[in-house]
Amino acid sequence: MKAAALRLGHASVAKRSISLVRPVAATVVPAQMAQKPDAEPIFGQEDNSDIQDAQFRVLGQPPTLCSVHVPASVSLHVRRGCLVSLHGVGEQNAVAISQEWIGLAWNLAKHGSWRAALFHQLVAPRAFSALVAPNVNGGKIASWFGVSAQQFRTLCLLDLDGTQDWCVLGKHSLIAYEGNTSLRIQRSSVWPSWLHFNRGDSALPSTYQLIQGRGNALLSGAGSVYTIELPNENEELILKGEHLLAISGRTPRDIAEAVTEYSFPAVSVPAIPETAVSKGRTPMPTSSLSAFSTALASYSRNAVSWLRHAYTSYINGTTKYLRIRGPRFLLVQSAHNAFMPATSPSAVQPPSSPVSVKAPASTPNSKDYLSYVTVGKDASVSFQSTPDFNKKVAEIEALKHK
């Protein structure tokens, strides 16, 4: 009996085994050849040693970089801070870099800054290549006055053949251009835009640069830049002034006459009627020193607000829509590079005297708004007002006990 029990106990015991295996070190087989990225060469693969004219090529989608091939003894003008790289230079081909101020007084008067006037002039005895990017930004003080700070910008290339003149607007618009004798850059008058005696009735902003002749000019726009063509003089376009980057025309006069200000029809709003002024509590008398402090603080705030508005209007011009007539080409930027007011001018005229609404004689009681609905057997509905529901609830309870 005991033997049978022992055999049964041994049969119910299960065996488990655990084996430990040492990991084998993995080996990585190195690549036999270097990996080639699927990208277009920035400077190209062609030989540029014999080129006669400067060649500009924008790169990327959207274009944020420009490759420039400069022939021997031809200068390249690049705005300060926008030069990214040089290629094809060395001991045998040293590039001479010098600073050049272009329209310093004009930029100080129009934009209140010297940054847009400082360019680098590059020239070498042999051909070389350069990379240019729109690395422009504004200062913190300028942004407080309404001039935009750093934002996303893209490049746009102008290839002038001498048949069209271009008016380029904006503080950060001109990034680079080739220095040949046939390309000319002029600037508008230093007078503000609200003085029209020097420009007739044109609504073209007074902060433009006129590019004429033959050659290449690299522009920069806020956001993305698009081209709009107005094929004939019957074509017109209404465009917000802050989004206009450049406009073409046969002559400067043709450009100025094609731009007029557009005003939307004003919506007539009835004037607010004046009501009698109700006399409330008599204000507590204040000391003369407290009254003087309050008045001085109010006048100071008004003076700062007026100065800021005047400076912003002088720098950016008034926010307005432009009616542009063809035939011509337009360069439009998707984002604006100027201060935008929070609200548009209202057509409502303020009253001549302060307005105050007389308080009602009595406040309506909430009991006057209580009502109950009775639905009859013939589907008729009747509404009745009641000061409270106590009486009606008692009637309903009495009907239930019947």
From Swiss-Prot:
One of its GO terms (cellular component) is mitochondrial inner membrane. Its main location: mitochondrion. Coiled coil: none annotated. Residues 1-25 form a transit peptide. InterPro entries: AIM24 (IPR002838), AIM24_sf (IPR036983), Trp_RNA-bd_attenuator-like_dom (IPR016031). It comes from the Eukaryota. The keyword Transit peptide applies. Residues 343-364 have a biased composition (Low complexity). Residues 343-365 are annotated as: Disordered. It is found in: Mitochondrion. One of its GO terms (biological process) is inner mitochondrial membrane organization. The keyword rRNA-binding does not apply. Belongs to the AIM24 family. PANTHER family: ALTERED INHERITANCE OF MITOCHONDRIA PROTEIN 24, MITOCHONDRIAL. This is Altered inheritance of mitochondria protein 24, mitochondrial. The gene is aim24.
